Amino acid sequence: MSLIQRLISSDKYSLKCPYSMTPKGICIHNTANDATASNEISYMQSNASSTSFHIAVDDNEAIQGLPLNRNAWHAGDGEIGEGNRYYIGVEICYSKSGGEKFLKAEDNAASLIADIL
């Protein structure tokens, strides 16, 4: 699966990804909604919340919104926790309704993660 880069502007690093990092692994989440990867990335990049993640994957595409050498606020373990500081955050789309789109998004995420590792 190819990864589309649509990286956040560096002026938002202080809010969304303030620390450089060397990733130790990948932390996978479900979005708990039915938005596309493009919509997930757009919302994450444009809102005023620090909550962030690196990649969103849906049934058609995978989009990277943050540099993989910067942290993201996705794991809920604060500023010093390893989840946020050392793991790439991947969001799988369409988890609210499930079904074929969600299953394809899971397959796409597995393929992408295998490529990253």
Q: Could you describe each region identified by the protein language model?
A:
Residues 1-117:
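Active-site-adjacent loop/helix surface patches within enzyme catalytic domains
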